Structure formats: structure tokens, C-alpha cells
């Protein structure tokens, strides 16, 4: 697999020779447009991974595990996006009536579960796993990932990438059983 993605002001070549990682990589980068020229790269091979962001090659010897690859790609994207007005974070964003709610939490804390439950209350999922936020004057969602992990299943949601102002931030510790709770958000 070989694809080039336009991320902010950089073009990232992603090259992978491990077929079982292709879907993860494509899903992880689905929020970005593809292009044809690159100025930085990540090359994932059976016995080593090489990446270059700021003119220096970094080499990781050995085959990356699925979970390590997920983190590495997120860190590379963060390195490209993060500056004084932009941040790329592990989060979700839901929206109703042009009011966005940023949901923060650790891996497997229940962000996707909360997103699914919010649909019942009329919310729309704008970002399922990673969010590119812009905070020039107010906090806005610039782009959101379409990759939704829920109950050990993975799917691509039809997330919109429209800018949405974030009106509230919700930090989640863990969601164990949503059948005993009613989803309600006060205005």
C-alpha cells in the first residue's frame, strides 16, 4: 500500500508492506485528502519502520504491533498539525443545534459508546476518534476522523468535516453499561 495524504501544510507518504495493517492505516488517515507529491514519510516494513518529518530519519527496528502503529501514526499527525492555533487529539465530537461537545478520555474509556448513545438524543457524530481542533478565537472542530471503534467492531461513519464551534468539554472516565443510564445534556 502506498498513499500520500495532505495534512495541514505537509504531504505525508505512507508506504506499508504489511497487508494486514492497510485497513488501519487507511481508516486512520481517512479524514485527510490524498495528493501526489510528498515532503515527509512513514515506511512500514516487516522488520523496521522508518519515518521522516523534520529532515531527520527515525528508525524503529523490528515489526510494529498493530497498537504501536496506531500510536505512531497519531504522533506523526500531531507533530504535523500541532502549533499555537491547532491541536490534534484523541477525542470525539458530537453536535446538536450547532453546539459541539468535545469528549475526552483514554483509550477504551467509552467515548464511542457515548457517541452511539448520543444519537438517540438527536446528536450527530462529527468526529469519532481523533479531532483536529482550531482555537484562534474560539474552539472549533476543523476536521474529524470517520473511524469509529465500538464493542470491538470498527466502522467508518459518515462524519461531516464542517467547522463546528465547541461549546462544552466532557471528560469521560469509563462507560460500563449504558442500559441503566439515560443520556441527557443540559443547555
Tell where the protein language model's regions lie, with residue ranges.
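Conserved glycine(s) of the Walker
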Residues: 109-111
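A noncatalytic interaction/capping subdomain that flanks phosphate/NTP-handling catalytic cores
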Residues: 1-107, 120-126, 131-187
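Post-Walker A alpha-helix
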Residues: 114-115
Amino acid at each position: 500500500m502506498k498513499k500520500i495524504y495532505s495534512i495541514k501544510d505537509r504531504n505525508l507518504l505512507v508506504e506499508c508492506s504489511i497487508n494486514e495493517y492497510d485497513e488501519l492505516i487507511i481508516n486512520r488517515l481517512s479524514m485527510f485528502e490524498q495528493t501526489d507529491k510528498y515532503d515527509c514519510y512513514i515506511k512500514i516494513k516487516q522488520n523496521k519502520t522508518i519515518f521522516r518529518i523534520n529532515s531527520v530519519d527515525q528508525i524503529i527496528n523490528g515489526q510494529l504491533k498493530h497498537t504501536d502503529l496506531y500510536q505512531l501514526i497519531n504522533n506523526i499527525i500531531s507533530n504535523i498539525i500541532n502549533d499555537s492555533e491547532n491541536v490534534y487529539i484523541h477525542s470525539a465530537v458530537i453536535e446538536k443545534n450547532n453546539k459541539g461537545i468535545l469528549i475526552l478520555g483514554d483509550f477504551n474509556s467509552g467515548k464511542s459508546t457515548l457517541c452511539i448513545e448520543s444519537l438517540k438524543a438527536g446528536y450527530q457524530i462529527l468526529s469519532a476518534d481523533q479531532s483536529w481542533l482550531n482555537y484562534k478565537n474560539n474552539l472549533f472542530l476543523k476536521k474529524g476522523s470517520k473511524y469509529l471503534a465500538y464493542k470491538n467492531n470498527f466502522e467508518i461513519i459518515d462524519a461531516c468535516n464542517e467547522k463546528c464551534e465547541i461549546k462544552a468539554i466532557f471528560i469521560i472516565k469509563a462507560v460500563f453499561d449504558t442500559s441503566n443510564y439515560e443520556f441527557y445534556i443540559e443547555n
